[in-house]
Curated annotation (Swiss-Prot):
Record-linked PROSITE patterns: DNA_MISMATCH_REPAIR_2
Native species: Streptococcus pyogenes serotype M28 (strain MGAS6180)
GO BP term, example: mismatch repair
GO cellular component: cytosol
SMART domains: MUTSac, MUTSd
Protein's job: This protein is involved in the repair of mismatches in DNA. It is possible that it carries out the mismatch recognition step. This protein has a weak ATPase activity.
Domain of life: Bacteria
Keyword DNA damage (UniProt): yes
Protein name: DNA mismatch repair protein MutS
Signal sequence region: none
Gene Ontology molecular function: ATP binding; ATP-dependent DNA damage sensor activity; damaged DNA binding; mismatched DNA binding
Keyword Nucleotide-binding (UniProt): yes
Family: Belongs to the DNA mismatch repair MutS family.
Gene assigned in the entry: mutS
Length: 851
C-alpha cells in the first residue's frame, strides 16, 4: 500500500513498525490501541473487529482498526494463541503537555513463549525453548517467563531434542542458524511451533553461572537475550539456571507419554481420563504445575523416591491434620506468577492482597506440618520462610477493599501515611464545608431552592433559576449563563474548592507513589517468595497423592535390586477410576530374574493393551513417589519406558502406521538397556502378514539376545508362541476366555501359556456385523483351517548361532534344479504388495501344482 503524504503521527508509526516487521504493532492513541495498514487488515479478520480507514477522503486512505486499551489483553491473547507476536507501543508523555507528536515507544513484545499477563489465567506452564547445535551435541534451554523457571541440558541427537520440546509443550523455539533445514521443517510443520532466530551475544553471566558446556551456555544465553529484548526490563523474578540431565529421570518419549495418557487423554486432548486428572487433588496452581512435572519426569533415585513415599505415608496416617492442611492450602494463591507480575511492574492492589492473604496462611500451614511430628516432614518445615515482615507491610498498607486498578484510588489503608490521611480528611470535611456554605447562603439570600452543584468545567457553583436572579447577593460572581438559570461562585466557595481539588490531586499522586514504593519493597522479597512457593507446591503435591491413595485404596510399592517384577492384583488406575472399582478386573504381573519377555496373545477387546498400560502406569506412579493401584508391588528401578501401543498414521509427516512402528521400534532397541521397560502391541501388523511376522520374530529375538529389557510383546501372530521353545527368557501368557454353547466370554484375566484361538469373528459379532456376513466368515475360517493348520515358527538361526547350525538347519524345498528354476521364476514375477487375498490364494494354488 502506498504510504506517501503521511502525517507526522503516521510517520512515527512507520518508524516504529520498521523495527518490528514480524509483529502486530498496537499503537496507543488516547483510549485505544490502533493498528494500521496491513496489520489492520489482517487483525480485523483475525479478531473480528471493524476495519475502517484514516483520512477517508484521501487518495489512498490508510486502513485502520482499533481496540479499547482496557480490554486490549483479550485481543492480544487471541493473536498469541494463533501464533503471532504483538508489539505494544505506549504514549511516553502526557498528550496535554506534549509539544508536537506525542512521544511513543514499544514497551514490550509479547510472543507465544513470553506470555505473562493473559486475560485467561492458566495454571499450566508456558515454556519458551532455545536450541543450539555445535556439530556434535545439542544444547536445550527452557524458561517459563511467567514463573521464572529456567533450566538447561544437552542432548545427543535431534530425536531427543524433538521429544523434549514436545514433552515441554513449548509454544515457541529460538534457533540460531545451525540447525539443518530438515530439522527446522520438523519443528515448524510437524510440531506447529513458532520459530524465532536469535544469535547469541549475551554477556551477563549472573543467571548462568556454573559448569556448563559451550553448547548449553549458548542456548541459555540465547534465551536470556531474547527475553530481555522482548520484555525490555530487568526481570528480577528469573531464577538461577538449573542444569539437569535426562538420565536423572525415567526417560519416556512424547509418543510414549501420549499413548499412556499421562497428562491428557490422547483421544480427546483433555485432562479428563489422564493420569494427571486422576492424581490431581492439589489446591494451588503451583501444586498443579509441580504434579504435572512429577508425572512427566519420574525419578530414578531410590532415595529420593522413598523420601516422597515416607511423607505420603505420614499424611495418610493423620486424616484430621491432612484435612486441615488441604483446607489451609486453598487459601494460597499463585506466588510464582504474582512474583512475576511484581517483577514486570504489573502487580495491582488485588495482586498484593492475594500475596498478603497467602502469607497470612503460611504460619497455619507451618503449624499443621509441625503437628505431624515426623522427621521427614520437619525437613520441609525447617525451610519454610513465613516472611512476617512482608505480610505485615501488605496487611497494614493495602486496603482490603482496594480496586484492581491503580488509578481509581482507595488503595492505601487509613493510618498508613499521615499526609495521605490529611488530604483525605480535607476531602471528607470539604464536603461538609460545602454543605454548610450552601445552607448559610440559602438563608442569607432568601433563595429557598439555592443549591451547590459540580461539573468538571465550572467546578463548584451556586445554581440560581431566572425567577430568583433579583435575590442574588452582591458577593456572588457569575460563572456561566444558561437558558433558564445562572451559575455563580463566591470567594469562600472557590477557596474550599481549591483546597479540595488540591487535596484530591495530591492524594491521588501520593497514593500512587506510596503503592509504587510498596511494590518496589515487595520486589526485594521475590527470591524468598519463590523458595516458599517451591515448598508449598511440594507439600501440596504430596498431600494430593495421599488423598488419592486413601480414596482409591492404593498401597506403598517396594523396590528391589534383583530385576524382579511382582504385582499382585494390579489395576490400571485410570481405567478403574472411570469404570468404578466394582467393574474393574485386576491382573497380577510377574517377571522373575530369568524372564525378560512376556509374549501375550488373545483377541482384541480382551484387555491386552490395558494389561500393558497397567504395568507402565504402575512403574510411573511408583517412581514419581506415589502409591499404586494393587494389593502388593515390588519393582526394579527402570531407566526408561518404550511403547508402541495403538496404531496411528503420522498424517502430518506423511508416515504410515508401519513406518511409525518401525521408527519407534528402532528407538527402543537402540536406546533401551537391561533396566528398561518395553511394551509393544501388535508390532508388524502394518505390513504383509509374513513380513510382519518375520520382523516381529526378529525384534523379539534381538531384544532377548542383545537388549535384555523387561518386555511385554502382544501379538496376533500365534505362530510366534513357539519361540518359547528356543528363547529361554521368554514366556507365553494369554487373555483367558470362557467358551460355552458357541458363545465366548472374555474374562480379562491373564493366564499362563499361549491362546488357542484369536476369536476375531466373535469380536466382529460384538461389533454388530450382519449375521450373514459372520456365517460366511465362519465357513471361510473352517475351510482355511482345514487346508492349512497354523504355520510353524520359522526356525531360521539368529546371528548368535553358529554357521554350522545354519548349514544343519537348511532345508531343500525342491527335488531337482529344473523345477526349482521354474518355481523361482514364477516367484520373482509376483507383485506381492499389489495382490488381493484371492489373487494370492490362486497364485499359491498354481505354484503348488508345479511341485
Amino acid at each position: 500500500m502506498a504510504k506517501t503524504n503521511i502525517s507526522p503521527g503516521m510517520q512515527q508509526y512507520l518508524d516504529i513498525k520498521k523495527d518490528y516487521p514480524d509483529a502486530f504493532l498496537l499503537f496507543r492513541m488516547g483510549d485505544f490501541y490502533e493498528l494500521f495498514y496491513e496489520d489492520a487488515v489482517k487483525a480485523a479478520q483475525l479478531l473480528e473487529i471493524g476495519l475502517t480507514s484514516r483520512n477517508k477522503n484521501a487518495e489512498n486512505p490508510i486502513p485502520m482498526a482499533g481496540v479499547p486499551h482496557h480490554s486490549a489483553q483479550q485481543y492480544i491473547d487471541v493473536l498469541i494463541e494463533l501464533g503471532y507476536k504483538v508489539a505494544v507501543a505506549e504514549q511516553m508523555e502526557d498528550p496535554k503537555q506534549a509539544v508536537g507528536v506525542v512521544k511513543r515507544e514499544v514497551v514490550q513484545v509479547i510472543t507465544p513463549g513470553t506470555v505473562v499477563d493473559s486475560a485467561k489465567p492458566d495454571s499450566a506452564n508456558n515454556f519458551l525453548v532455545a536450541v543450539d547445535f555445535d556439530g556434535c551435541r545439542y544444547g536445550l534451554a527452557y524458561m517459563d517467563v511467567s514463573t521464572g523457571e529456567f533450566c538447561v541440558t544437552d542432548l545427543a541427537d535431534f530425536t531427543s531434542v524433538r521429544s523434549e520440546i514436545q514433552n515441554l509443550k513449548a509454544k515457541e523455539v529460538l534457533l540460531g542458524f545451525d540447525l539443518s533445514e530438515e530439522e527446522q521443517t520438523i519443528l515448524v510443520k510437524q510440531m506447529n511451533l513458532l520459530l524465532s532466530y536469535e544469535e547469541t551475544v549475551y554477556e551477563d553471566k549472573s543467571l548462568i553461572d556454573g559448569q556448563l558446556t559451550t553448547v548449553e551456555l549458548t542456548a541459555a544465553g540465547k534465551l536470556l537475550q531474547y527475553v530481555h529484548k522482548t520484555q525490555m526490563r530487568e526481570l528480577s523474578h528469573l531464577q538461577a539456571l538449573v542444569h539437569y540431565e535426562i538420565k536423572d529421570y525415567l526417560q519416556m518419549s512424547y509418543a510414549t507419554k501420549s499413548s499412556l495418557d499421562l497428562v491428557e487423554n490422547a483421544r480427546t486432548n483433555k485432562k479428563h481420563g489422564s493420569l494427571y486428572w486422576l492424581l490431581d487433588e492439589t489446591k494451588t496452581a503451583m501444586g498443579m504445575r509441580l504434579l504435572r512435572s512429577w508425572i512427566d519426569r519420574p525419578l530414578v533415585s531410590k532415595e529420593a523416591i522413598l523420601e516422597r513415599q515416607e511423607i505420603i505415608q505420614v499424611f495418610l496416617n493423620a486424616f484430621i491434620e491432612r484435612t486441615d492442611l488441604s483446607n489451609s492450602l486453598k487459601g494460597v494463591y499463585d506466588i510464582e506468577r504474582l512474583s512475576s507480575r511484581v517483577s514486570f511492574g504489573k502487580a495491582n492492589p488485588k495482586d498484593l492482597l492475594q500475596l498478603g492473604h497467602t502469607l497470612a496462611q503460611v504460619p497455619y500451614i507451618k503449624a499443621i506440618l509441625e503437628s505431624f511430628d515426623s522427621p521427614c516432614v520437619d525437613k520441609l518445615v525447617n525451610d519454610i520462610d513465613s516472611l512476617p515482615e512482608l505480610e505485615y507491610l501488605i496487611r497494614t498498607a493495602i486496603d482490603p477493599d482496594a480496586p484492581a486498578t491503580i488509578s481509581e484510588g482507595s488503595i492505601i489503608r487509613t493510618g498508613f501515611d499521615e499526609r495521605l490521611d490529611h488530604y483525605r480528611k480535607v476531602m471528607r470535611e470539604g464536603t461538609g464545608w460545602i454543605a454548610d456554605i450552601e445552607a448559610k447562603e440559602r438563608q442569607a439570600s432568601g433563595i429557598n431552592n439555592l443549591k451547590i452543584d459540580y461539573n468538571k468545567k465550572d467546578g463548584y457553583y451556586f445554581h440560581v433559576t431566572n425567577s430568583n436572579l433579583s435575590l442574588v447577593p452582591e458577593h456572588f460572581f457569575r460563572k456561566a449563563t444558561l437558558k433558564n438559570s445562572e451559575r455563580y461562585g463566591t470567594a469562600e466557595l472557590a477557596k474550599i474548592e481549591g483546597q479540595m481539588l488540591e487535596a484530591r490531586e495530591e492524594s491521588s499522586s501520593l497514593e500512587y507513589d506510596i503503592f509504587m514504593c510498596i511494590r518496589a519493597q515487595v520486589e526485594t522479597y521475590i527470591n524468598r517468595l519463590q523458595k516458599l512457593a517451591k515448598i508449598l507446591a511440594t507439600v501440596d503435591v504430596l498431600q494430593s497423592l495421599a488423598v488419592v491413595a486413601e480414596t482409591n485404596h492404593y498401597i506403598r510399592p517396594q523396590f528391589n535390586d534383583n530385576h524382579v517384577i511382582t504385582i499382585q492384583e494390579g489395576r490400571h488406575a485410570v481405567v478403574e477410576k472411570v469404570m468404578g472399582v466394582q467393574e474393574y478386573i485386576p491382573n497380577s504381573i510377574s517377571f522373575d530374574q530369568q524372564t525378560s519377555i512376556q509374549l501375550i496373545t488373545g483377541p482384541n477387546m480382551s484387555g491386552k493393551s490395558t494389561y500393558m498400560r497397567q504395568l507402565a502406569l504402575t512403574v510411573i506412579m511408583a517412581q514419581m513417589g506415589s502409591f499404586v493401584a494393587a494389593d502388593h508391588v515390588d519393582l526394579p528401578l527402570f531407566d526408561a519406558i518404550f511403547t508402541r501401543i495403538g496404531a496411528a498414521d503420522d498424517l502430518i509427516s506423511g508416515q504410515s502406521t508401519f513406518m511409525v512402528e518401525m521408527m519407534e521400534a528402532n528407538q527402543a532397541i537402540k536406546r533401551a538397556s537391561d533396566n528398561s521397560l518395553i511394551l509393544f502391541d501388535e508390532l508388524g501388523r502394518g505390513t504383509a502378514t509374513y513380513d510382519g511376522m518375520a520382523l516381529a520374530q526378529a525384534i523379539i529375538e534381538y531384544i532377548h539376545d542383545r537388549v535384555g529389557a523387561k518386555t511385554i510383546f502382544a501379538t496376533h501372530y500365534h505362530e510366534l508362541t513357539d519361540l518359547s521353545t528356543k528363547l529361554t527368557s521368554l514366556v507365553n501368557v494369554h487373555v483367558a476366555t470362557l467358551e460355552k454353547d458357541g458363545d465366548v466370554t472374555f474374562l480379562h484375566k491373564i493366564a499362563e501359556g499361549p491362546a488357542d484361538k484369536s476369536y476375531g469373528i466373535h469380536v466382529a459379532k460384538i461389533a454388530g456385523l450382519p449375521k450373514s456376513l459372520l456365517k460366511r466368515a465362519d465357513e471361510v475360517l473352517t475351510r482355511l483351517e482345514t487346508q492349512s493348520r497354523s504355520t510353524e515358527i520359522i526356525s531360521v538361526p539368529s546371528q548368535v548361532e553358529s554357521s554350522s547350525a545354519v548349514r544343519q538347519g537348511q532345508l531343500s524345498l525342491f527335488g531337482d534344479e529344473e523345477k526349482a528354476h521354474e518355481i523361482r521364476q514364477a516367484l520373482e514375477a509376483i507383485d506381492v504388495m499389489n495382490m488381493t487375498p484371492l489373487q494370492a490364494m490362486t497364485t499359491l494354488y498354481e505354484l503348488k501344482k508345479l511341485l
